[in-house]
């Protein structure tokens, strides 16, 4: 148990999940970011969603994991981005002097949650039409 806790502790600086009942996750490391895939495994109850806690660089963020969805969290350079839609793609997250430029491709309306590991704040960004969008998120 101690070995597992130590290994998990080392991962939180790149983005990790606290253990939660009925929420499974896996991690994929790309050359420029980490993507966490979350799955609500509670198919027996009448609960449509389960709470979980995302940890990034010492900050903790509550997230909701919906039934029948694979949720994703993309982590890069101190910013984590979680789209609401399964068809939204986070194309890039690039650190700049006072924040990040994120490039997002949507197939319709969507909201992405930007979780700032520097300040601990969460900022939702709303997209009102499909396409490729580039937005700046302040540090």
Predicted regions and their residues:
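Non-catalytic C-terminal accessory domains or segments of carbohydrate-active enzymes
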Residues: 1-139
